[in-house]
Amino acid sequence: MNNNNNNNEGVSSSSSSSSSPLPNISSPNLISNSNIENDIEIKKKSNNNNNNIFEGDNSHIYNQFLGEDFNVVHYTSNALKVSSISLSLNTLTSCTRELGQELTENITTNYDDLFKLANNIKELDQLTDTLKLGVSNLEESIQRMKNDISEPYNKVKSHIGQLKRVQDSCELLRKLIRYIQLVKKLKNHLQAGSRDLSKSAQCINEINLLKKDSDLTGINIIDSQVVWIKTCSDQIITISSTLLYQGMENQNQTDVANSLQVFHNMTILNEKVYSIVNLTTEKVIKNIKALLNVNKLIADLPKTTITNNINNNNSNNNITTNNNNNNYNNNNNNNNNNNIISTSTDKSIWLKFESLIDTLYSSLIQILHLQRVLLKIKDPLTHKSLMEVLLIKQHQLQQQQQQQQQQQQQQQQQQQQQQQQQQQVGTTSNNTQPILIEMISTLFWKSILKVLENNLLVAAKSSNIIENTFIREYPKVSKFFLDFIKKLQNYIDIHQMDIQQQFMIVLSNINQIIGNNNSNNSNSNSNNSIESSLSTSSSSSSSSSSSSSTTTTATTSLILLSADDYKLSLFKSIGLFEKAYLEYSQSKMSTIVNGLFPQSTWSSRSTLPVIPNGKQLVDLSKTIWSEIEWLVGNNDRQLLGKLMLVVSKVIDLFSSKIESMVQPPGLIVLNSNIGSSSSTGGVNNNSNSNNNNEIITINENSKPTPSQTVNTLLFNVSIQLNSSIQSLLTSQPLERESIIVIEKSLNSLITICTNIITPLMNSFFTHIEQIFSTIHNEDWYNEKTTKMLINKSNQTCSSYMESFKTLVNYFQNQYLMRFTPCQLLNNQIKSMISKIFIVYLKYCSLLKQPFSENGKLKMVNDLTHLEFAVTPLLVSGGIKEIGESYNLIRNYKQSIFN
């Protein structure tokens, strides 16, 4: 009965499998949940029994066999070591018997559950057979579906392949047609000549792009024209390069623009432009090195000059005398020979230097013209100027190079040990250079200045001829440079003003691109730091350091250099020679000043000091004048201002020398018998007086002391130099700042002169005041008419006025006549005369009034003699220039009879 049921179930399952490939597994033949629960209970019971066995007296024996590290050999060897082997066997036998008894009890207790589990296994086998039958039915269904689908699929696949090949063929035919059309256009453009060079270049570029995008090798029509197209490309590049060079030399904007457009169309603009800049730079560098080649300079000297110099030297060496004059003449001959060689060398240097400046100017003008055309010409597709395209391409190339360097640095960094990573990171960050974008004119100019400065320094260190030439005749170098800057200024004013707007557009676009790139780099670095923070702490620090060290930044230095920028940088390159020239000029003039004063101090016990004479001062003035006039003629205001500082220092040195030689004025005492011809004058040394002052008694026969003579000579020397420098300041178009600097030094010289003349004037005025104090001894109130008043033709003055006239005459003849007339002396005399008038009026006002008629006439007569006595003292002008004090004298004279 059960077998029939099973057969029926198999039939039903087979019938169902025909309709569905999968069997119906939701039948009552599956293992129920109750059976699973019974299994769990049986396991629990067995576990409880096991726990009872293993927790008994023999638990330690069972635990030995249950351990994972149980070893039969080890256990057997331990059992053999025991003294009673039979006891161990009995123990194992009893344990085995106990385990067998435990198993029998578990089987007897749970036999129902064990039978159920066996029945479930039989049902599981039946279910497995049913599942296998369903799987086989499913495979048959899939095979039938595969057969139904594969045939149309293969047909569609075949049609798709055919369509793809047709499309590829059409695409290839279109490219061939385009290629043939471009070749035809290229031939037409080439027949037109240089007018269509840019179009020919565009055709060649498109042909190259077609060949690059798709593999056209193996096609006869293309392979046959590869060599011809390459020849045409080389020919176009050659013609365009020649046209570009000619356009740059002739300043032809059309030729340069056409050539640049050709290079741009052929995608070689960046390469060609920088190649031209490098070639132009090398040409100038070659001229610089040729100029500063000492051996070549000596080789270029005239052979006759060198031969004559050798003969003269030999003849001079054969003459030996003990006379100092002859030795001096021999030295002069040698110096003259050296001067001849130096002069010939100088001529050769300046000729080459002039050629260098011309080459530098022409090369710079060519680069500026090229830059100007690059700014003006635009790409017809993007409408960007070619300069912008050039700079962007250059920026990309530099960025790629720097990224490659950074990748190499990172690879090296990863290969090093972990302890050295921080040190390597710091080194990497220092080696990372920001990308600098500059105009081509700036690149050219920087390269030239660097080479010029380095070669000048090397040549100066290796040759005294070049060093002396460029130092002693530095104004010539400055003159060449100023002429260069002047011509460059004219060119910039004419040709550079029309590209300011285009330059500002390029500058804005480049800054925007660089800003975007820098922001992208910063974002990528921040992302790297975030990713590194998710890793371990040690790797995080190294990753963040590495990311910070590989940051790529770009900066711009896009400026159109003005003439002032070129001038500043050009003169900066020869700044050392300018400094040396100023030091040389100062040394030359200081040597002359020191030669004027071989003895800077002097005392009354020694001989008279050596005072510079007029010829020596003329030589000093000529030296100063020649240096300044040289620079004024060159219109070198900047160097002239620096030279004026040097002249100021020389004048200060002269002033210090003069000041150190000025002698104390002494204490001048007026002799009481100054009106007597028998009185004598001289110098009396008072032992109780100050050592720096001497008591000098003067009268009409006395003469100035040696100290006063020295001071007078020093005054005259200072005034002569001051007058010469003042004439220079007024005759030359100097800057106001330079004039102020020189006048400041001249004021110190004038101060010394004032200190020389002022004590003498004060002493003279003191004596005059003493004479005027005797006016009270005169009789101003006697009415008697004297012979003096009757005989007016031989009219004389009062006795005090006679003494005054004698003193004035003595002072003028013995002192004032020795001083060089100048404005300072005239001002001092005017001031003294003004004080004389004031003090005379003071004493007159102290006289008792009224005067007698005789006294009034006498006073008027004295006033007249006073005017006549002081008038000869004035260096220039009349007595009326005294001013207010003279007006007071006139008014007082008129008021006597009122």
UniProtKB/Swiss-Prot annotation:
Gene this chain is encoded by: cog5
Keywords tagged on the record: Coiled coil, Golgi apparatus, Membrane, Protein transport, Transport
Positions of the UniProt region annotated as Disordered: 1-30, 311-339, 519-551, 679-705
Protein name: Conserved oligomeric Golgi complex subunit 5
Chain intervals with Low complexity compositional bias: 679-702
Gene Ontology cellular-component annotations: Golgi membrane; Golgi transport complex
InterPro entries per UniProt: Cog5, COG5_helical, COG5_N
GO biological process: intra-Golgi vesicle-mediated transport; protein transport
Keyword DNA damage (UniProt): no
Membrane topology note: Peripheral membrane protein
Coiled-coil ranges per UniProt: 129-192
Signal peptide per UniProt: none
Pfam families tied to this protein: COG5_C, COG5_N
Species the sequence originates in: Dictyostelium discoideum (Social amoeba)
Localization of this protein: Golgi apparatus membrane
